[in-house]
Regions:
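N-terminal membrane topogenic signal
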Residues: 1-11
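Active-site His/Glu-centered metal-binding helix of metallohydrolases
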Residues: 14, 40-48, 65, 69, ...
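Juxtamembrane helix-capping/reentrant segments at transmembrane boundaries
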Residues: 1-2, 45, 49-70, 106-122, ...
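Membrane-embedded alpha-helical segments that form the functional core of polytopic membrane enzymes
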Residues: 15-58, 74-94, 140-155
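Membrane-helix boundary/interface segments in integral membrane proteins
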Residues: 95-111
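Helix-loop junctions at the membrane-solvent interface of multi-pass transporters
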Residues: 21-25, 80, 105-106, 132-136, ...
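C-terminal membrane-associated helical module and adjoining short loops/tails
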Residues: 2, 15-16, 32-40, 110-173
Length: 173
């Protein structure tokens, strides 16, 4: 746990409440800066872990959890501010729980379902879309495009996880 990538992941988790406090205080530019730092730290911890062979079980679990915490916190803020419809967040939550359930079934079979490229694209698209919504909150067109990008990449990646790993269900007992 004392690796640099794990420390970066922990910092991202700590940045989450800082982001929320700033956003809910109406300090959107500072909240945006914290959000961008958190997003960039997501890229940094993964890069460092791979480059210096510091991949850990802690990082495999906490890194995606930190991403979900940040993204879902931003989405909750956008629901409350009227920038994002609740149904879009419900789709994201459904996909996250469904893929997590799929991974749990796979673990029972001593299998690991690695992150798919579509999942990485979904995370990047979501982080960029939410950042755009934060930076330009009054531009409705940006909100519409951002929500569409989030929903489309979320649904696509969720379907791909289940199609590629459908054999998990045939082996389930």
């Amino acid at each position: 746990m004392n690796t640099l990538p794990n420390k970066i992941t922990l910092c991202r988790i700590v940045l989450n409440p800082v982001f929320l406090i700033l956003a809910y205080q109406g300090l959107l530019l500072p909240a945006f800066v914290v959000y961008i730092i958190a997003c960039l730290s997501d890229m940094a911890d993964g890069y460092i872990a791979r480059k210096y062979n510091q991949i850990s079980n802690f990082g495999k679990f906490m890194d995606p959890l930190a991403d979900k915490m940040l993204v879902l916190s931003a989405m909750c803020f956008f629901i409350e501010s009227g920038q994002m419809p609740g149904w879009a967040v419900a789709i994201v939550l459904f996909r996250e729980f469904a893929v997590s359930g799929l991974r749990l079934i796979a673990v029972e079979q001593n299998r690991v379902i690695a992150a798919a490229w579509s999942g990485k694209i979904k995370t990047a698209a979501t982080m960029i879309a939410l950042g755009a919504m934060m930076l330009l909150p009054s531009v409705k067109f940006i909100n519409i495009i951002a929500v569409a990008a989030i929903v489309i990449t979320t649904v696509y990646s969720g379907i791909e996880y289940f199609v590629v790993n459908k054999d998990v269900f045939t082996e389930a007992k």
